[in-house]
A protein has these predicted regions:
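Acidic, Ser/Thr- and Gly-enriched intrinsically disordered low-complexity segments
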Residues: 1-170
Length: 170
């Protein structure tokens, strides 16, 4: 396999004016979509409406991201500090696995918070190999699926939808 020598590139999320970060695991797939709008009006003396093009829509990308705070350091994204935490965490007995997965899911979830100075959430760039996407996080839901004995969330799936930003200049 010629790809065995190529290091795995992690998806990076770069919030405008904020600190960029890598996802812990790359998504298995993503869905890219775009819509156009058509207006319908009833024609005179016809059984079918008259259809007229009404405008284009922005592109959107949907991802399902996996987060696991019990992983070992070599298999996850993040910086050196994150990898060291994960490695140490994977060696602890179950009761000691206390890295709250929300530490990592909140980095994404907070991309929907409104910047008080700009009055909008931050514009983000998604970078993953040849995928380069600029837009806003418009929808996000988190399903927590594993917990420590104390009830701390340890694993989660996150469904995210990003909508393309189109500059008013274009």
């Amino acid at each position: 396999n010629p790809n065995i020598l190529v290091p795995l590139e992690k998806m990076t999320i770069e919030p405008e004016g904020g600190k960029s970060f890598q996802v812990l695991y790359n998504p298995e797939s993503y869905t890219q979509s775009r819509e156009v709008r058509y207006a319908q009006s009833q024609g005179i003396s016809t059984n079918t409406p008259v259809v007229q093009f009404a405008g284009g829509g922005a592109e959107s990308i949907q991802f399902k991201l996996f987060f696991d705070s019990m992983s070992s350091g070599s298999e996850v994204g993040g910086g050196v500090v994150d990898k060291a935490k994960f490695l140490g965490n994977s060696l602890l007995p179950s009761i000691g696995k206390l890295i709250d997965v929300r530490t990592y899911t909140n980095k994404v979830y907070k991309l929907m918070e409104i910047d008080p100075d700009k009055h909008v959430p931050p514009l983000v760039k998604l970078k993953w190999s040849t995928l380069q996407f600029k837009g806003f996080l418009v929808s996000c839901s988190i399903q927590f699926v594993r917990f420590s004995e104390q009830g701390t969330p340890l694993r989660a799936w996150m469904d995210c939808t990003f909508q393309e930003y189109i500059s008013p200049d274009k």
